[in-house]
Structures are given as C-alpha cells and as structure tokens.
Amino acid sequence: MSRLNINFLGKELKNNVITSSGCFGFGEEYSNYFDVNELGAVNLKGITLNKKDGNKGTRIAETPSGMINCIGLENPGIEYFKDNIIKNIKYSTPIILNINGATIDEYVKVAEIANEIERVDFVELNISCPNVKNGGMAFGASCESAESTTKAVKKVLSKKPLIVKLSPNVTDIASIAKAVEDAGADSVSLVNTFLSMKIDTKTRKPLLGNIFGGLSGACIRPIAVRMVYQVYKAVKIPIVGMGGITNYNDALEFILAGASLVSIGAGIFSNPILPIEVINGIDNYLKENNISNIKDIIGAAHL
C-alpha cells in the first residue's frame, strides 16, 4: 500500500491531494499539464440549479500574495452538466461535485439530481452562498442556518457522502462545523475565501464589478491553518483543508493541524503542476521521516 493511500468516507483514494472547486474547471482543462488520474480526487466547478452567467464587470483583482475574485458562480446548470459534461469526462479519478443555491429549496433540488449521477462520488455543499430569503446573509453565517441547510440536503442525498464547505467569514467556525456535523454532514471542508474588496484609486471606485469578492492565495494560509486546527478539536468527522497552499510544506501544515485531505486552489493559476509537486513532496517527507502512511500524521500538531 502506498504511503499516501487514504480511505475517505468509504472511498479509497490513491493520495490525499485534491483540487478546489472553481480553480480546476471540470478537470479536463488541466490534462495537458499532467495526468489528472494522479490526483486523489477532483472537485469540480460549482453547479447551480439553473444556468448562471456570472457577475458583470471585472471579476478578478490581484493583491499581494493572493487574488480577489467575484466570478459569480458562472456555470451551465445541473441538468446540462448531467446530460453533457459529466458524460465526457475521461479521467477515472473520484469526483466531488460542488453544489450551490439561493434558497434551501434550490440546494435540495440540485442535490436530488446529483444523487442520481453515478460518476459523482461525493457532494460538497457550499454554504457560503447568500440566502435570498434571509436578506442575503450566507447560509453558513450562523449555526442555525448552516444546520438547517445541511439537514435538508442530507435528507435527499442518500447515495453520496456529504462534505459541507464552511465560510471563514464567521466569528466561531468550530461551532458551525459542529452544527453541520450534528445535522448529518460526513465531512467539512475549509476554508472558503475571505470577503474583501479592492478600490481603483484612478477611478475612485470599487475595482470589482460586484464590489466585494473572495480573497484567496498564500496570504490567507495562516488563518486557514488556524481554523482547521480549531475545527479538528470540535468535530469527529474528517476535514478537507485548504487556503493558500503553494508547496508541499504548506499542505503538511494543514495535515498536521487536522486535515485528512488537502485541496489546492489559487496556487494552480501560477503553477499548473502544483498538485503533482505537492503529492511528490508529501511522499518524500513521509519516506525521509520513516512514516508508513499519511494517516499517521493527521492532527499530529495537537498537544
């Protein structure tokens, strides 16, 4: 058995390195850079019930050690995805489908369709979306809304393990993680992007078309690692850790803090083969330190 093999929610993965939703398209786009089958899993671009064109205006802004994006969940919708895209995916790597909604009813409808797509191995529930029936507050902004959304989706998701992606824009992320665990989540992934903005000093206006966007990149990593550490102490379900990973050592920090899987996001944009470098780096680390399997160091930083 490989040092990197890991059983995640009943599925055997060849390693614990995956890609983040929104940074890897549907996977095929990166096949010219490396063999996607080398990844532990692929997390696909976020899907909604109906097609979304995304936000107008500028969508991406560079910032020191990171980037701000407000793509607006541009995607073809779950039905088109089911009937066209998923059928044409050639790689055999396990797939995580990231689902989104503007209401709990929308989440449930997307989950019902995802539940019947055989090629999808896991569903990731993105609760950072704004709840249009609750003044735009994100579904993951409180324990109550996070729990009710998770419970509703879990009820119809009978064939797939449920990962809940947590927002970092909260006061106590550990309490929210515990709430979604109690609601039936099989795993939590964290962190999503941090709410931020950039102002164009020439026009004296917000640079992004949506005014606010999500900050990602190396600048958020220390905060993300801290949050993974806190959540690991609060829940018993496995954690997918992410936020600013640019090399294998960054990934190891998340693993030592308590992440079973690590997810590579914005770092791919500047280094398309980063996931493979991280896989090889972790493997060498385990070999050099005589560690038989990656699971032996998950959460090892806890005293």
UniProtKB/Swiss-Prot annotation:
GO cellular component, one term: cytoplasm
Xref: SUPFAM superfamilies: FMN-linked oxidoreductases
Paired cysteines (S-S): none
Pathway(s) where this gene product acts: Pyrimidine metabolism; UMP biosynthesis via de novo pathway; orotate from (S)-dihydroorotate (NAD(+) route): step 1/1
Keyword line: Cytoplasm, Flavoprotein, FMN, NAD, Oxidoreductase, Pyrimidine biosynthesis
One of the GO BP terms on file: 'de novo' UMP biosynthetic process
Note on how the cofactor is bound: Binds 1 FMN per subunit.
GO terms assigned for molecular function: dihydroorotate dehydrogenase (NAD+) activity
Catalytic site positions: C129
UniProt xrefs under InterPro entries: Aldolase_TIM (IPR013785), DHO_dehydrogenase (IPR050074), DHOD_1B (IPR033888), Dihydroorotate_DH_1 (IPR024920), Dihydroorotate_DH_1_2 (IPR012135), Dihydroorotate_DH_cat (IPR005720), Dihydroorotate_DH_CS (IPR001295), Dihydroorotate_DH_I (IPR049622)
Classification via HAMAP family: DHO_dh_type1
Known role: Catalyzes the conversion of dihydroorotate to orotate with NAD(+) as electron acceptor.
Quaternary structure and partners: Heterotetramer of 2 PyrK and 2 PyrD type B subunits.
Family from the record: Belongs to the dihydroorotate dehydrogenase family. Type 1 subfamily.
Name of the protein in question: Dihydroorotate dehydrogenase B (NAD(+)), catalytic subunit
